[in-house]
Amino acid sequence: MIAVLFLAILCLEIDSTAPTLDPSLDVQWNEWRTKHGKAYNVNEERLRRAVWEKNFKMIELHNWEYLEGKHDFTMTMNAFGDLTNTEFVKMMTGFRRQKIKRMHVFQDHQFLYVPKYVDWRMLGYVTPVKNQGYCASSWAFSATGSLEGQMFKKTGRLVPLSEQNLLDCMGSNVTHDCSGGFMQNAFQYVKDNGGLATEESYPYIGPGRKCRYHAENSAANVRDFVQIPGREEALMKAVAKVGPISVAVDASHDSFQFYDSGIYYEPQCKRVHLNHAVLVVGYGFEGEESDGNSYWLVKNSWGEEWGMKGYIKIAKDWNNHCGIATLATYPIV
């Protein structure tokens, strides 16, 4: 049913009568399709090939402009090459803001000094990059990421936690399978539930199923959670003093879909149009410290083949670029 729906959307976005294909790209197309295990019926293949070619040429143009100094990051073809941007955003994001009770607010004025560089991966706070698949469940991965870090801080043990536990057990009043959710609601669930299962005991599948939580498999708990004021300075202090922080960003753009490396700056990014949840695990500079080369180090949940082995550097101190500081939060354990 989902495949049929997206094919219908695709036909509306592309002239499906007879898309003109570029035979000079036959080799690249076949190599890409083989690498990613893509198989289509006859009608769909022409449409998907047309989308892929459009994306391929857009990436090529961007990278030429990068060499000319017009951009600070590169793009590359990846597993999302046959998706239109509309499809991509619907299938691969997953942040949906919802009502939540009043919560504690991070008191950033208490911290006067913070280091210039932070990378919590180096101190053991961060689990390997995960993959949400074609499911808008980024909120669950962002929530487990910050909770994994706080549990490591408390216990000295880094244990991957179960996103599937969240998808299956939170209830339709809070989230709906692969249709998006909110990290604070995930923290509230863990608090009310008295725990969250390990990934090993409750592995990720995707679309929600019957809840199968068992308390004996819990490896985390939440006492409360904290909202960080929507300023980059406050987020910087929280990342430095607390650990990995759950945030939401605007990931609506082709440039995010095909990000490869470098400091991501997208002029069309919005501070309030937030649709994708990620995890800030640090910050720093590329090269010498100067205006324009600072970044947030962000863990994504699209597998290690995307971006910088699953990570992206988002422009820092650029007026809250892509809304990275707008809705930042972490759990108290």
Curated annotation (Swiss-Prot):
Glycosylation sites: N173
Gene Ontology MF annotations: cysteine-type peptidase activity
UniProtKB keywords: Disulfide bond, Glycoprotein, Secreted, Signal
The keyword Secreted appears for this protein: yes
Tissue specificity as recorded in UniProt: Expressed in testis and ovary. Low level in spleen, epididymis, kidney, and uterus. Expressed in primary cultures of Sertoli cells.
Cysteines engaged in disulfide bonds, as pairs: C135-C178, C169-C211, C269-C322
Domain of life of the native organism: Eukaryota
Listed Pfam families: Inhibitor_I29, Peptidase_C1
Protein location: Secreted
Signal peptide: 1-17
Residues of the site described as Ancestral active site: S138
Gene3D superfamilies to which the protein is assigned, alphabetical: Cysteine proteinases (3.90.70.10)
Gene Ontology terms describing biological process: proteolysis
SMART domains: Inhibitor_I29 (SM00848), Pept_C1 (SM00645)
Family stated for the protein in its record: Belongs to the peptidase C1 family.
Protein name: Testin-2
Organism: Mus musculus
